[in-house]
Amino acid sequence: MMKIGNLVRDAYGSLGVIIKYSERSNRHVWVQWCAGDSCTVHVRNLEVIDERR
């Protein structure tokens, strides 16, 4: 289960932090990328690197 605050990586190797859940779909999350932008991403395209408990 992906939670807010988890450090994630996408298929391209970009790192980001989950900042909130999408209002439209329960399988999408908002990610704040280290490059500075943010967008929604389907959870199947993300790998959790560090889980915040």
Residue ranges and their predicted role:
Residues 3-50:
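Basic/aromatic-rich interaction segments and small domains that mediate binding to polyanionic partners
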